[in-house]
A protein has these predicted regions:
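SF2 helicase catalytic motif II
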Residues: 173-195, 199
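A substrate-engagement module of RecA-like helicase motors
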Residues: 12-15, 19-144, 209, 216-284
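Conserved RecA-like ASCE P-loop NTPase motor core of nucleic-acid helicases/translocases
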Residues: 14-21, 425-426, 504-515, 631-632
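Non-catalytic, alpha-helical, charged scaffold/linker segments
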Residues: 66, 200-371
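Conserved RecA-like P-loop NTPase helicase motor core
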Residues: 471, 480-485, 538-637
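A contiguous, basic/glycine-rich beta-loop/short-helix subdomain that forms a polymer-engagement track
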Residues: 110-141, 154-167, 320, 327, ...
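Conserved helicase motor "Helicase C" RecA-like lobe of SF1/SF2 P-loop NTPases
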Residues: 510-537
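Conserved interdomain hinge at the start of the Helicase C-terminal
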Residues: 478-510
Length: 678
């Protein structure tokens, strides 16, 4: 932060600081208060950017207040709390910001006040000029420091890249040119999500809603493209005709109740027929149709019915794309040519709508058409296609055709790193192995794979620094050898270890089901000993609030999944024990198999070492910290532990021995405050 702020001030420029997790973003925001201690200067110089779904939508709030007579009591109280918060909030961040979600009386109500469904009507909204999201976007153009996440940073870079290829100007803002990527080991994952193509039912429903607006009995607020532009194009009959063509074409996309219709084998429209054929091929090639987890299969060899429906769906998309492209060109001409008073009233709305049109007409729909074109063939070089039926707790919730790049950092390097004037990528776990071994070329190769640096014309500069912590003195690593995968034994192990540590324990799981089962089993025993237990996917709080509660109560315990393995900073007494349920192997799905084929047989080990190292990294945050890292998996091979700090002996112990070691180590002199309660 210090070098970034100094450079920004001296050069009157902007530096984007990008993270992967909300937890680290919050920590950086707190640290920036030390860089800019004056609150007024901080507000002027720094912008925190998050996704749309984080900010309170003022129009949603207005509509909820209109429903006061029919709200239940706790929802009425919740709305009053939000109203009080609105008068004091800095940025309107309802999810993980300054809103006290821990005190919220109606879990699940607050997220409904954000725009998670893409219902924003932009310039047509009466609150547009006061909109928290728009205000943050405008402010980021003049800030010295912009704190974002990897996904938003890539969105911004892609938007400017697309604008360079059209007549657009990127909304009048200069593109980001200087970056600091913290949590750089997650660039690969962020790019994998951002540069993927998902032709799924949920995506199709959203595209239809964006064009036609809410339909059926959903009662959702929002206006589609047709309603937003009808008044603007009132004196342009040819453009109104194009708008009508687009609306008619959107009938080929899934509508409300599409999953039920597919289950009943009664699809409507080209895309629903395509999705039903996808579902049929996946089910025909799956061995366990009753699995609670998602099903997937290769596209090739393709079933004739799927191929025929893919061709029909592609033609339907062409019928949407062609008039959409023509409409976008005409709207941009109108923005350049018309300055009359009547059109000036609509200018802001047209600019907002045009951004949405170009995003879909230039990126989304052409990408879908490209993937459908190749459905009977192998995916183009460097990519992998597959069909999937996504499930949650045994119920289908999405179906689609998916295309991912085997190495998504190629696009990241092209769109983000190459145009940049400077990019600094940092992480304590960028390299694969422990420090002495990872000074070799192989160690840095893993870093280049995760960050895309290997795709740059000029090689990236490398720098590594020795940790300031004495891990051999401050920590212990234990592999428990006699805990099976039986749910009761696993729960008993967590219970005994948490009690031995006297709280201050973080339990990490590879599945939500196992987490919930363990929570049910150990909560009574911990409660009897005065050890509060919090858990993701159980407590109705966002991850940031759970971590805050865990941090403040030194004897509490917390259960979580991946989000708590990365980017959580809990120094001091509040975290002295980390327990992994099992070795966090990557899931051997179709995409992972393709990557393992390209990156080599050691790819699985690289990912697993990274995850273990990240979990261990939560434990020691200060020179005065002490803690124990426990892995409840007797089959953990020693090679996977090579990424953990050197000098710390890996002890393979029985559960009883591990419990005794945890208790003894945490009671050693120098950590008296961490001693478990008697």
């Amino acid at each position: 932060l210090a070098p970034a702020s100094l450079w920004a001030e001296r050069n009157e420029g902007t530096v984007w600081i990008s993270t992967y997790t909300k937890n680290l973003q919050r920590q950086i925001a707190q640290e920036l208060r030390r860089v800019y201690p004056d609150p007024a200067v901080l507000a002027e110089k720094v912008t925190i950017r998050k996704g749309r779904e984080n900010y309170l939508c003022l129009l949603n709030f207005e509509e909820q207040t209109g429903r006061l007579p029919v709200l239940i009591e706790r929802e009425t109280v919740a709305l009053g709390l939000v109203a009080r918060w609105l008068m004091a909030t800095k940025d309107g961040d309802l999810i993980g910001g300054d809103f006290p979600s821990w005190a919220f009386p109606a879990p699940g109500f607050a997220p409904g006040l954000t725009d998670k469904q893409g219902e924003c009507i932009y310039g047509a909204c009466p609150h547009y000029r006061r909109c928290f999201l728009e205000r943050v976007g405008r402010k980021s153009r003049t800030s010295r420091i912009v704190v974002s996440n990897h996904a938003l940073t890539m969105v911004e870079a892609a938007r400017h890249a697309a604008a360079r290829g059209t007549d657009g100007d990127g909304n009048g803002a200069s593109p980001p040119l200087r970056y600091v990527f913290d949590e750089g080991h997650h660039i690969f994952d962020a790019a994998d999500s951002f540069y993927a193509i998902h032709i799924s039912g949920r995506e199709g429903v959203e595209l239809r809603r964006w064009i036609r607006g809410p339909e059926g009995r959903s009662g959702r607020r929002g206006r589609g493209l047709v309603e937003r532009l009808t008044a603007v194009l009132d004196d342009a009959p040819q453009e109104l005709e194009r708008l009508n063509e687009i609306a008619q074409g959107a009938l080929a996309l899934p509508g409300e109740g599409w999953l039920n219709r597919l289950s009943s084998e009664a699809p409507r429209g080209a895309m629903e027929k395509f999705l039903m054929a996808v579902r049929a091929q996946v089910r025909a090639r799956s061995e366990d149709l009753h699995s609670p987890y998602g099903l997937e299969c290769e596209v090739v060899p393709v079933m004739p019915e799927l191929l025929a429906n893919a061709i029909a769906f592609k033609h339907a998309l062409d019928a949407i794309r062609e008039p959409l492209v023509a409409l976008a060109l005409r709207l941009r001409e109108m923005l350049r040519e018309r300055s009359d008073e009547v059109f000036s009233q609509h200018r802001m709305r047209v600019e907002a709508v045009l951004r949405g049109i170009e995003r879909r007409a230039v990126l989304q729909i052409p990408n879908w058409i490209m993937a459908l074109d190749a459905i009977g063939e192998q995916a183009p070089g460097g990519h992998v296609d597959w069909l999937s039926v996504e499930r949650f707790e045994g119920h289908d919730y999405d179906i689609g055709l998916y295309r991912h790049a085997i190495d998504p950092t190629v696009s990241f390097a092209l769109e983000v790193l190459e145009p940049a004037h400077g990019a600094f990528i940092t992480s304590a776990t960028l390299r694969d192995r422990a420090p002495k071994e990872s000074e070799t070329v192989d160690g840095w190769r893993a870093a280049e794979i995760r960050t895309g640096a290997g795709h740059l014309v000029m090689p990236a500069q490398r720098a590594s620094f020795v940790s300031p912590f004495d891990y051999a003195r401050q920590s212990r690593i234990i592999v428990v050898t006699d805990v099976s995968r039986d749910a009761d034994m696993l729960s008993a192990a967590y219970r005994d270890l948490f009690i031995a540590a006297g709280g201050g324990a973080l339990g990490l799981f590879t599945s939500v089901r196992s987490l919930r089962a363990t929570h049910r089993a150990i909560a009574p025993a911990l409660s009897q000993r005065g050890l509060p237990l919090y858990a993701q996917h159980v407590d109705g709080l966002d991850t940031g609030s759970l971590v805050d509660l865990f941090r403040e109560d030194e004897n509490s315990c917390l259960l979580g999944t991946d989000a708590l393995r990365d980017g959580v900073d809990v120094p001091g007494r509040s975290l002295r024990l980390v327990v992994f349920e099992r070795v966090p192997w990557p899931r051997p799905d179709i995409l992972h198999k393709a990557r393992r084929s390209q990156f080599g047989r050691g790819y699985d080990d690289q990912l697993t070492r990274l995850r273990l190292a990240q979990g261990f990294g939560r434990l020691i945050r200060r020179a005065s910290d002490r803690g124990v890292f426990v892995l409840l998996d007797a089959r953990a091979p020693s090679r996977l532990l090579a990424g953990l700090p050197q000098g710390v002996e890996v002890q393979r112990l029985s559960l009883a021995e591990a419990v005794a070691e945890v208790r003894a180590f945490l009671q050693q002199p120098g950590l008296a405050d961490n001693r478990p309660p008697q």
